[in-house]
Amino acid sequence: MSVADIAHTKWEFHSLSSIIELIGGGTPKTSIPEYWNGDIPWLSVNDFAGDSRYVSSTEKHITQAGLDNSSAKLLRKGDIIISARGTVGELAQLSEPMAFNQSCYGIRGISTKIDQAFLYYLLRIVVNDLRKSAHGSVFSTITRNTFESIEVPLPPLTNQNRIAKVLGSLDDKIAVNNRIIETAD
């Protein structure tokens, strides 16, 4: 499925960068033990690679001092995370606040323009365009400029809410079915 497949003739197109806040991550110094093993979940792409919509746990945690003394940022519940280096384009939505490393971007929709749940599903569609635009000599990288080059259709907010509810309901049913399959094995 492509952006053109979902665009309604009355929907306006916007550059992706004009409807989102793009947030960079960071890593506290690993040589300072006081920055690690705290209570703040710290995401890397290994924590959310896969088909699940939500990420709810992380392998590593940092302390408040680690967050305060590094370029790591704390994302909010509902924010979206996308891998930007190496394994480009892995995507998930946060089920709780988490910090994250510099190999990812946090994505927060501008609330007056886009519903956050709708944004997640829209990104699922444009992720292949983001991957195609990735570049790098050693490994693929999505840059801030990549988000400026992608145009997306936007229905009115009320339509976005309705679309996101339907798709969210389907995701919930898929998750239940997957849990049933896992317990049957």
Go through each PLM region and give its residues.
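A structural connector/turn signal
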Residues: 69-70, 95, 137
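A short glycine-rich beta-alpha junction/loop motif
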Residues: 84, 98-105, 136-164
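Short, positively charged
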Residues: 115-146, 150
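Short, Lys/Arg- and Gly-enriched loop/turn segments at beta-strand edges
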Residues: 88-95
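Short peripheral tails and domain-boundary helices/loops at the edges of structured domains
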Residues: 100-120
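Sequence-specific dsDNA recognition surfaces
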Residues: 13-33, 46-77
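Non-catalytic DNA-recognition/assembly elements of restriction-modification systems
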Residues: 1-26, 149-162, 168-185
